[in-house]
UniProtKB/Swiss-Prot annotation:
The active site is at D228. Residues 37-159 form the THUMP domain. It catalyses: uridine(54) in tRNA = pseudouridine(54) in tRNA; uridine(55) in tRNA = pseudouridine(55) in tRNA. NCBIfam families: pseudo_Pus10arc. It comes from Methanothermobacter marburgensis (strain ATCC BAA-927 / DSM 2133 / JCM 14651 / NBRC 100331 / OCM 82 / Marburg). Belongs to the pseudouridine synthase Pus10 family. This is tRNA pseudouridine synthase Pus10. Responsible for synthesis of pseudouridine from uracil-54 and uracil-55 in the psi GC loop of transfer RNAs. One of its GO terms (biological process) is tRNA pseudouridine synthesis. The keyword Isomerase applies. Its EC number is 5.4.99.25.
Amino acid sequence: MDVQERLDAILDITDSKICPHCLGRRFSDVMEGPGNRLRGERLVEKFSLHLEGPCLVCGDVFERLDEAALRVREKVDDLNLEYSSVLVGTRLPDDVLRIDEEIDRRLGIQVEGIKREVNRELGKRVTSILRCPADFESPDLVITVDLRGQIRVHVQINPIFIEGRYRKLVRGIPQTKWPCRSCRGRGCSRCDYTGKMYPTSVEELISEPVLEATGGSDSKFHGSGREDVDVRMLGTGRPFVLEIKEPAIRTPDLRALEDEINRRARGMVEVADLRFSSRNRKVELKESSRKKYKVYRAIVELEGAVSDEDLVKLEKLDLIRQRTPLRVSHRRADRIRERRVLEISWKRLDDHLELIIKAEGGLYIKELISGDSGRTEPSVSSILGVPARCASLDVLEVGEPA
């Protein structure tokens, strides 16, 4: 149908109770123009139309957008947030969405839906009144305005991400907060009512000063792999990303934070190279952990004498078939993994042996040494022909993909 026929059909369906926005939107596919409202006003002028209200399609929702934008500013101001970008969305009455779709169906046309226009028009007002741009990919704030009855505003504060590297300089600290096995975090006599298996963790030592500086509600720690509780993380440290949820401050002074974390950690943990990051980096860090090589220093106890000729045989360690270790089988899938030892060197230390092992990520080093009752093959123990045990272990380097 031509413009006149479409116009007549619209006026008949709505009994002329339609606003310029909802009228102009139905001609966006056949008429150029700077916007639906102006397009509708041109149609009114050109065809001498007399439109009545309230609009049968939208219920005059467009007349409420200025008020809605003011309500958004009030809400955001009350929250006292730091932000530099927003994304605005709305909730409309179901009958408005249904009528809008039904009219287009009866006309046999495919044009922009009412919700998209309302979002755009309100978004323009909000970004203007807040003096910040819209960001459709990674906004600081996601603002949802409920226009179903009384105007209600909900503000979602998106997280910030800070990455860096940490060194764990003492043993006996887990990477992340470890809930008590008995009470599962509720607090009991076993955990001295702390809800934790250990007094602190790398995660807590790093996150607590950051939460204070940002006013965040919670945090989540993402490491590039993890070391055991009794293992130190030395060298240049392990990469991590700290996710801070609902921060009031999005750009804290990272140099000052670095100093504060290190001061409060009292030599247990150190951080370096703090910088702002992104959600994608969190995913990359997790996915790359398996591909990174690790360098370890292991002090090994041997239950028997071995010659230097025996020790040279350790250089043959290459492809390792490792079944899920017994010590983690209660929380890891029972399967066989293949990992490679990339380099190994040895040095005698009195009645112990020092091994420097470079290996692919995901290889369990303690079990590489002991053999784990035959679940890891080959192993240091099987090659030397004597029982071997890892007395202490340090991670010296978390490198780039091997």
